[in-house]
């Protein structure tokens, strides 16, 4: 009788831990999908400003603070530079993602992207 009670408690514990893991992975994937939206915003700013100019960088930093609590940022060799029409700007989005529900350190991931300047 006692063995079945212990097994029932263990089953519940394992089941709840599995549910928590699935929820944590789902929340992490949602945060990961935000990177694509931010990369699209970076592409728009490069196209509109003719590169990652100071104005574009300030807008992207403000956008990251408002929408993503500062978790995303842009790095590039062409930062604060205006480029010619049709030139490709390569950049890197750095994402500091939190693991929700578990006390684990933040995960830093880097995503590469590029966009073409559309300003003459």
Swiss-Prot record:
An annotated GO cellular component: membrane
Subcellular location: Membrane
Membrane topology: Single-pass membrane protein
Superkingdom of this protein's organism: Bacteria
Keywords: Membrane, Plasmid, Transmembrane, Transmembrane helix
Chief place where the protein resides: membrane
Name under which the protein is recorded: Uncharacterized protein pXO2-21/BXB0020/GBAA_pXO2_0020
TM regions (residue ranges): 8-28
